[in-house]
Amino acid sequence: LPGKRVFSAATSARMRQLMRMIVVDGTGRKADALGYRVGGKTGSAEKPGVGGYSRNLVVATFAAAFPMDNPRYVVLTMLDEPKGTEASSFQRTAGYTAAPVVQKTITRIGPLLGIIPDMKRDVDVSELMPLLWKAKGE
């Protein structure tokens, strides 16, 4: 839809690269729906309780857009007090809980939206990879 541009084309392209990088090699890896070029952002927050924040209760959120070379759709998943499983090493953060929900959602709704998975195309994030922090040994 035509409208007033809020960000420059360069800023928009860089944000799409950054969001794709989060899914390719960051905290959102479990959201990657092959061929759909998903980009996104994880968010995990401790819930407030009496006298401060609860270390045991969290809200996990993953906001995704796809396909990132020409975003058309957004999927937002928010899980209130997710439980970690053995498969997630009992982690409750968004990368382990909300991101897989996004991956399954996009894989199922993509074809209904007329989006054909394309394994040959992707968003080039190679210039950003040196910026990605990695723990020693990874």
Question: Language-model segments: what does each one mean?
Answer:
Residues 1-2, 10, 16-114:
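Active-site beta-strand/loop architecture of penicillin-binding DD-peptidases
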Residues 6, 14-17, 21, 124-138:
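Acidic, Ser/Thr-rich low-complexity intrinsically disordered segments
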Residues 31, 35, 114-132:
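Acidic/histidine-enriched alpha-helical segments
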